[in-house]
Amino acid sequence: MVKHIVLYRLKENVDKEAAVKLIASVLEPLVGQIPGLLHLEIRRAYNGMDYALYSEFESREALSAYSVHPLHLEAKTHFSHLLETRVASDYDL
């Protein structure tokens, strides 16, 4: 199993609460639609970043497939213009 954690900072003029709700609404439903994606949640962060994405995958291969999956790429079009900074880390369990 692989854990995938991403911290994001949104652009300054973005409504943070609305953005987090939007991002969650397009990414969280991907669980069950993309093979190997076991869990995904979005939450507001409080450590200098605006929100955190936490997800679990069956394997490294599943994480790699998710990153280029058409449903994931389409979902990103709804919010990528809101992002300023992204920091990610993955680790095996």
Residue spans of the language-model regions?
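Short S/T/G/P-rich N-terminal loop/turn motif that feeds into the first structured element of a domain
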Residues: M1-Y51, E58-V68, S89-L93
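A generic structural signal for short, non-catalytic loop/turn and secondary-structure boundary residues
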Residues: P35, H81-L82
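Long, contiguous binding/interaction regions
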Residues: L73
